[in-house]
């Protein structure tokens, strides 16, 4: 998502991530204490976030932003592929679909990367332009109501990025 997904990552970028895994519903990890796929990928994701965002003597490698994952902070840190598809089809807000314009699968098996890209395109093509425009106008109005205009804010305001 964000600058990583759109290919404009720079040294001060944070990583907007959604972690999606593909496993059977009853899949178990190997080892002394087997874990369900959900538990395994949750622990793996948390370890990854810690490793990438931990403070070091020269600073952090990257800040990780997971707020765009399905259900935000209330949702799991790693989501199964089927749950992600269901969420996008049935529960996601328009702004979450718009965020998909800057989403790219950056790791995984090639067939899954292709499957994600096809799914992303199908979601983006399913919207009627008129509905998106009306939703955007409403969303911008709510943003302007909630946040006072700052003349130095290049992001939010008439003629600015948002």
What are these regions (language model features)?
Residues 1-162:
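A nucleotide- and high-energy phosphate-metabolite-utilizing enzyme signature
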């Amino acid at each position: 998502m964000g600058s990583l997904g759109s290919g404009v990552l720079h040294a001060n970028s944070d990583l907007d991530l959604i972690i999606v895994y593909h496993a059977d519903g009853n899949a178990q990890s190997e080892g002394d204490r087997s874990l369900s796929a959900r538990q395994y990928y949750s622990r793996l994701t948390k370890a990854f976030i810690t490793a990438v965002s931990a403070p070091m003597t020269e600073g952090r490698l990257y800040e990780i932003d997971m707020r765009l994952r399905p259900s935000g902070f209330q949702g799991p840190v790693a989501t199964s592929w089927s749950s992600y598809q269901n969420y996008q089809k049935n529960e996601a807000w328009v702004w979450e679909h718009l965020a998909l314009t800057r989403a790219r699968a950056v790791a995984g098996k090639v067939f899954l990367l292709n499957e994600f890209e096809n799914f992303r395109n199908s979601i983006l093509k399913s919207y009627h332009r008129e509905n998106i425009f009306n939703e955007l106008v409403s969303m911008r109005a709510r943003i302007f109501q909630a946040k006072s205009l700052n003349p130095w804010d290049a992001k939010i305001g008439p003629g600015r990025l948002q």
